A protein has these predicted regions:
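C-terminal substrate-binding/cap subdomain adjacent to the FAD-binding core in PCMH-type
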Residues: 45, 64-230
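Short, basic, low-complexity termini and linkers enriched in Ser/Thr/Gly/Pro
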Residues: 1-2, 210
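FAD-binding glycine-rich core of flavoenzymes that anchor FAD
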Residues: 3-93
């Protein structure tokens, strides 16, 4: 399983209405426009995670256990296959992000989450960093469970960057002006509608130009954000 490509695992989970909550990222699209076909072992070794990280943590926060071999040839086992209280050292957090220097992974057990029923993304247009920063602070402290947020600055001197960004908005049939903040709300439709209503008041969105990406627009947008195609 540690050699299994992450895209294959995501496909299997999707067929069962589940997902990896930490949102795997794929740097291959940024470099050559196609997947780098990373393995689950590679993701754990590098501890890479996508846009939900500030809410659900990184890969290391979703490892239940692992088996591996250290530099002396000793077999190492840590954790288990279920979520429960345990004692001793949490080696899973130690090996995550160690880039394979501590142990060669042979088996990994990860937590998975129910797949979110739907999502929307709110785009807030502004070139004023102070205002954007204040919005970020409010989003982070909000009880309305924003699952992702990012700031995309305008870069007029970087034509490829602006071209990629404009393609996203052309696909979404939206006008694009300057820099913008994007944040995502996930869950069932009723919950999304209620939280959006509260966030509009909480963030004073009436003072900003804004637009909304529906679920079919939001999913590819965050794929490109997670894969660093918009940066």
């Amino acid at each position: 399983m540690y050699k299994r490509q992450i895209q294959d695992i995501e496909k299997i989970l999707d067929e069962n209405n589940q997902e990896l909550a930490f949102e795997p990222i794929d740097f291959g699209y940024m470099i050559n426009g196609q997947s780098n076909k990373g393995t689950i072992g590679g993701y754990v070794a590098c501890n890479f995670a996508g846009s939900r990280r500030f809410k659900v943590g990184s890969v290391r926060d979703h490892i239940l256990g692992f088996k591996g071999v250290n530099g002396k040839g000793d077999i190492i086992k840590s954790g288990g296959t279920v979520v429960k209280n345990v004692t001793g050292y949490d080696l899973s957090k130690l090996i995550s992000g160690s880039f394979g220097t501590l142990v060669v992974l042979t088996e990994i057990t990860l937590k998975v989450s129910p797949k979110k029923q739907s999502q929307i993304t709110v785009i807030v247009y502004s070139d004023e960093i102070k205002k954007i920063s204040n919005l970020f602070d409010k989003i982070l402290s909000s009880s309305n469970e924003v699952s992702a947020a990012t700031f995309i600055p305008e870069e007029p001197n970087h034509k490829n960057y602006e071209h990629t960004k404009n393609k996203i908005f052309k696909f979404n049939d939206l006008d694009h002006e300057g820099s913008f903040l994007a944040f995502r709300i996930e869950g069932d439709k009723r919950s999304i509608d209620e939280r959006l209503k509260e966030l509009k008041i909480e963030l004073d969105l009436s003072n900003f130009k804004s637009s909304i990406l529906d679920v079919h627009q939001s999913i590819p947008f965050w794929k490109k954000v997670n894969n660093l195609e918009l940066f």
